[in-house]
Amino acid sequence: YEIMPSLVGSEMCIRDSICTLKNLILKYVYNKPLLDADELFEKCMEYKEKIAPFVCDTHTYIQNALKEGKEILLEGQLGTLKDPDFGIYPMVTSSPTLAGYGCVGAGIPANQIKDIVCVTKAYSSAVGAGEFVSEILDEEEAQQLRIHGGDKGEFGATTGRPRRVGWFDCVATRYGVECQGATQVVMTALDCLSYLEEIKVCVGYELDGEVIDYFPTTPKLKRCKPVFKTFKGWHCDIRGIRDYDKLPQETRDYVEFIESKIGFPITMVSNGPEREAIIHKIK
């Protein structure tokens, strides 16, 4: 994260001065052995064949694609609340996570972005510390959602560490899609809630005795308590259904209530991990 803005990074090309700069840092900052330019060159040549097909003048490549009318898809890794400016600072990442920054990273003019799709699960989850208003604090209840959640449960893919889980948060989600400038929302993992007889949705925050429906700054967020609305669960297996209208009424009520609270159209939902499990709500 630091190398490029510090102006000490290396581009995908050979520069005679690259070792000179790096060696100054190694010698006077880290007191480490210096790099040998010839050895480094040989090592880079080993990697060249693997990465060469993916290196090009991306500006020209993208501009030509736009002129030819091709569709370009940009995918962000993290959500709004991990953004260093608009997220729950300091529990954020080090680079922007908003859709607008996709233009910067890819070199696409901002006026060329026509559709911004925000993806949210049908419940909430989090990794690591930080404010989590709708978190399920009862460990037994949380563990049940972890087991049923995700593709292989809500556990770290590498460490196996249990993730924090909670009910869907309309306040945080509305804030998130507003910051992203969403044109549509996709709700995934509806099937993960099928075991529940009742499902809660966080519809507001209680802050110092007052109920609010906006997402506050981090110091205030620390004092917020969730305000829940309880829904009757569908309590049946909904996997395999491919038509939105054939989902249980309780499932549709859940989706459409959330849609009304966040103020953005939910155009697709999913009821399983497969590609085929994407259901178009709005055709």
Task: Locate each region found by the language model.
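A charged, amphipathic alpha-helical module
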Residues: 19-80
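Short, basic, glycine/proline-bearing loop/turn elements
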Residues: 38-50, 154-159, 231-244
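A glycine- and small/hydrophobic-rich beta-loop-beta segment
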Residues: 102-230, 238
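Conserved active-site and cofactor/substrate-binding residues in soluble primary-metabolism enzymes
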Residues: 16, 35, 39, 53-60, ...
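Single conserved hydrophobic/aromatic residue that forms the stacking wall/gate
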Residues: 1-9, 14
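Internal helix-turn-beta structural module
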Residues: 200, 210-283
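Short acidic, glycine/serine/threonine-rich loops at helix termini
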Residues: 83-87, 93-94, 127-132, 197-201, ...
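General beta-strand structural signal in soluble alpha/beta enzymes
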Residues: 51-56, 73-75, 82-83, 112, ...
